Amino acid sequence: MSSDIGDVIHKTNSMEIADNYPKTCQEFLNIRDEMFELFLRKQADYGPTNVGMGSEVVDTDDKVKRSLIGLSVRMNDKVQRLLNLTLNNKVPNNESLEDTFIDIANYAVMALIVQRKQWGK
């Protein structure tokens, strides 16, 4: 099967999903936009060296490793908070569960950017 046919099949399946679940797909796009807005606000506060562990540009294997460790710790903090709140039926005192989910998603995207050595560029 050529890649052109594969692309057509993929686009057809994607369109069927979007057509069958329009509210779900629209909400996904809305959340993506919220994630990006939060990312921009936090980057304005923290700057790129926060993720780069002191380096503005993450472009070496060593910098990638250090940055991924830092991001993993931050993600784990959020996951542990989420587990504590949900397993113990607690109401959050500070940030909402929704904020926690968005933070985890943003950390995951940031980790991908770091992994691809595009952070700070």
PLM regions with names:
Residues M1-K121:
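Intrinsically disordered, low-complexity regulatory regions
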